[in-house]
């Protein structure tokens, strides 16, 4: 947090005077580069997800979107969403001195450049991607408070327009109303849900 050009904020940090807010937390994972492309997926920022996989291999599915940054593009939508989260009044900016591990981080970076040169080579983004008609970002309110199910309602409206629905999520935890919505949708169309197996999922209660 004390490094040049780096600013870190905690979203809705713990406040013991408001214990009912302890479970209001972020679970978004995305990286935006130069306002033109982004990676969005389910990886946490730890060695298990982004490490060298020497002891255990962890496989996640990510989406790479390359955009021209036009006014209605999804990268603009994602950037606006980030700014709305970043500016929440409960957030706290982290201040402190540079870590003693900064040198080790630089050494790690140089090691990666030497051992994984392909990761640092220029990329042909057009060759690596496929054209799509539209990409839209859907999300709930960024406020750390009880929310109405806006995102679920939007997903249900989208699923109602299709004949064959594939829903992919790392784990699925529904309340009674959501199970009712899925049952209603499945009565008129094919609905398939792809999720982790209990043996491999990090949240067994939400896995198949």
Predicted region positions:
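Charged, low-complexity intrinsically disordered terminal segments
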Residues: 1-28, 33-208
């Amino acid at each position: 947090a004390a490094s040049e050009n780096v600013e870190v904020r905690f979203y809705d940090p713990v406040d013991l005077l408001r214990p009912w807010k302890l479970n209001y937390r972020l679970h978004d994972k995305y990286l935006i580069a130069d306002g033109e492309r982004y990676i969005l997926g389910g990886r946490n920022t730890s060695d298990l997800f982004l490490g060298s996989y020497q002891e255990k291999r962890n496989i996640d599915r990510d989406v790479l979107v390359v955009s021209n940054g036009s006014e209605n593009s999804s990268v603009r939508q994602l950037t606006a969403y980030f700014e709305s989260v970043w500016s929440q009044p409960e957030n706290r900016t982290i201040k402190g001195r540079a870590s003693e591990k900064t040198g080790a981080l630089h050494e790690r970076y140089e090691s990666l450049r030497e051992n994984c040169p392909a990761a640092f080579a220029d990329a042909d983004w057009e060759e690596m991607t496929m054209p799509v008609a539209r990409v839209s970002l859907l999300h709930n309110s960024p406020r750390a408070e009880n929310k109405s199910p806006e995102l679920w309602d939007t997903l249900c409206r989208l699923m109602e327009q299709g004949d064959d629905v594939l829903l992919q999520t790392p784990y699925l935890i529904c309340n009674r109303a959501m199970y009712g919505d899925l049952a209603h949708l499945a009565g008129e169309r094919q609905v398939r849900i792809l999720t982790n197996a209990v043996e491999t999922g990090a949240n067994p209660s939400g896995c198949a």
